[in-house]
């Protein structure tokens, strides 16, 4: 018979302790990394909440040579490097998942309500960006960046991050531009580095003791608890790897960037998005990271776009019930976001890399996990998970065939096929991702 242990049981290191996860036994039976000659591939995933106003966002014509919609007009100068992908979805997902869509956008999680409880699923809710970061992240100081309008991971069903590790745990986002800049570019003093090295050593000692003590505890556990403990210890190993990575980069100088155009004192959402796009550009240009996720707004976004003359919060605006005035305001917001995206893409496109541009070596995915309308019509403000607005820019040197408006019919083409395309274009040898079993047709 397995003897129960206390819920207060901890694994003790020297001078510190780490609490265990809840186990059944606790209840009575019951670098800027490489040289410029390297083939550098990058991936950026940008999420806009609540969907878009369909009638003014989608181009009317399909195929090559389409005309950008009024909302996306700022992208016209780069149309040969931008594709609109119409009709993608997560086919096995419920047609309406409320505001849990953001957490599912890059994961393809589709097993009902469990994602609302703990973000996780049997496939571990591994987001495609983190799968890529796990493969190439050792080449840069930061394996990936998670950015958002709101900091942290959020709460179940209201994610503030798009990124989930292999165990389904959300990776918290940063939302303070100055803090992002400091992390990326402000050098530590010699004293700072010495103090940080001491902290690394203490943490490593604690983790070593915890791992050692866990082995004796494991013999007392049942099968289910051993699995839970195994997942817990896997997270400890991840921390160890991160400590090793941080120590490796500790004495590597951080890159210098021209900050003359950076405006950290933003007054509204438009200015905030602009400075975040600037920081994203600098992080890619300096090869500080090659994988970025960015939420340009969270689901149930309560911001009022006052700079556009909008006097209703974004979330309420999305529940327009067919009101034409509100839908016109939505078009204004959609266009402002597209204009800011275009500025980011132009900057990548105007920056040389090898025989082309940074944009040709960078795939930028922009879209939403929610369709605000019905099909391709405006509707009355829904939370549909079908026919998701999706745009892919760049990646011409990574095998992406750009300059198209592609339409996928019948709500059967998985968004995860696009994720397979992203992974393979980033150099991963994988032929599936969740329900994505092949590259997305038409892009290569």
What is each residue range found by the language model?
Residues 1-444:
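Ligand-binding pockets and gating/stacking loops
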């Amino acid at each position: 018979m397995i003897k129960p242990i206390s819920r207060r049981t901890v694994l003790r290191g020297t001078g510190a302790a780490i609490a265990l996860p809840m186990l059944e036994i606790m209840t009575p039976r019951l670098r800027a990394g490489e040289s410029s000659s390297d083939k550098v591939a990058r991936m950026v995933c940008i999420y806009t909440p609540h969907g878009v106003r369909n009638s003014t966002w989608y181009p009317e014509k399909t195929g090559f040579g389409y005309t950008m919609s009024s909302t996306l007009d700022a992208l016209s100068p780069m149309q040969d490097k931008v594709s609109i992908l119409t009709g993608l979805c997560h086919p096995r997902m419920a047609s309406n998942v409320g505001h849990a869509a953001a957490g599912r956008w890059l994961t393809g999680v589709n097993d009902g309500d469990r994602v609302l409880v703990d973000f996780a699923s049997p496939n571990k809710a591994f987001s495609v960006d983190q799968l890529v970061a796990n493969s190439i992240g050792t080449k840069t100081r930061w394996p990936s960046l998670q950015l958002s309008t709101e900091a942290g991971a959020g709460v179940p069903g209201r994610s503030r991050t798009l990124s989930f590790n292999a165990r389904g745990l959300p990776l918290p986002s940063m939302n303070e531009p100055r803090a992002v800049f400091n992390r990326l570019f402000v050098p530590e003093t010699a004293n700072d580095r010495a103090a940080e090295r001491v902290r690394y050593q203490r943490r490593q000692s604690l983790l070593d003791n915890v791992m050692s003590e866990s082995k004796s505890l494991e013999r007392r556990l049942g099968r289910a608890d051993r699995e839970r403990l195994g997942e817990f210890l896997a997270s400890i190993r991840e921390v160890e790897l991160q400590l090793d990575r941080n120590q490796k980069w500790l004495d590597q100088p951080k890159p210098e960037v021209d900050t003359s155009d950076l405006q950290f004192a933003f007054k509204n959402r438009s200015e905030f998005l602009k400075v975040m796009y600037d920081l994203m550009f600098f992080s890619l240009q300096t090869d500080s990271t090659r994988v970025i996720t960015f939420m340009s707004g969270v689901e149930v976004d309560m911001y009022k776009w006052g700079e556009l003359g909008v006097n209703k919060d974004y979330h309420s605006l999305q529940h327009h019930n067919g009101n034409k005035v509100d839908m016109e305001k939505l078009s204004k917001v959609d266009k402002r976001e597209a204009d800011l995206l275009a500025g980011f893409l132009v900057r990548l496109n105007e920056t040389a890399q090898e025989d082309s541009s940074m944009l040709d070596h960078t795939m930028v995915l922009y879209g939403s996990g929610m369709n605000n309308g019905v099909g391709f019509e405006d509707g009355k403000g829904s939370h549909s998970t079908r026919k998701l607005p999706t745009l892919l820019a760049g990646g011409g040197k990574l095998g992406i065939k750009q300059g198209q408006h592609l339409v996928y019919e019948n709500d059967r083409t998985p968004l995860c096929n696009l994720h397979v395309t992203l992974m393979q274009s980033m150099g991963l040898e994988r032929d599936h991702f969740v329900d994505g079993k092949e590259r997305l047709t038409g892009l290569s």
